């Protein structure tokens, strides 16, 4: 599939399936804890400065945000999880919204699960990966903020993440930096393969 990634726009925000776009376009969901760099990932992948707004306040994305890419596919930005300052009730509501989308959306082709290369995956990261494996949803692990770690230590951090996730070697694992754009081509290759 040839994609003009510059031709991208935010299409709509949805709280439940009655608001989802009604068509056949394939979707790739982006999941990760608050402040893992999801907005930066979207902006880097689409060569845009601020199509997805990066927020200094984690937990800002409270809806599913659908991004139209060249009228051929969509990114779906899922609310960041694991942010402590949101009430338990609010977190449960997000959880249900995310689960409904991931388990019932026929357009969904894969989930890009973002983790921070600098840290061990959180319990939420592990739970998300296990959830995707359980429901047999194809998953691409993208380890963000690679520029914050010396290249010589990438392997060590990658191994630690894979061990904690109990990573399935048949899944894609991509080291990514929105600063240097490292991993951008690999991420697109992995995504397009899933469409």
From Swiss-Prot:
In its UniProt record, a GO molecular function of this protein is:
GTP binding
Q: Which domain of life is it from?
A: Bacteria
Keywords from UniProt, A to Z, are: Cell cycle, Cell division, GTP-binding, Magnesium, Metal-binding, Nucleotide-binding, Septation
- List ligand-binding residues for Mg(2+): 39, 61
Report any one BP term from Gene Ontology. Answer: division septum assembly
Query: What positions does the domain EngB-type G occupy?
Result: 24-195
Annotated binding of GTP, by residue = 32-39, 59-63, 77-80, 144-147, 176-178
Cite the InterPro entries for this sequence.
G_ENGB_dom (IPR030393), GTP-bd (IPR006073), GTP-bd_ribosome_bio_YsxC (IPR019987), P-loop_NTPase (IPR027417)
PROSITE patterns, from UniProt?
G_ENGB
**Names of the cofactor(s):** Mg(2+)
Annotated Gene Ontology cellular components are: cytosol
Pfam families per the UniProt record, alphabetical: MMR_HSR1
Role of this protein: Necessary for normal cell division and for the maintenance of normal septation.
Q: Which family does it belong to?
A: Belongs to the TRAFAC class TrmE-Era-EngA-EngB-Septin-like GTPase superfamily. EngB GTPase family.
The molecule here is called Probable GTP-binding protein EngB
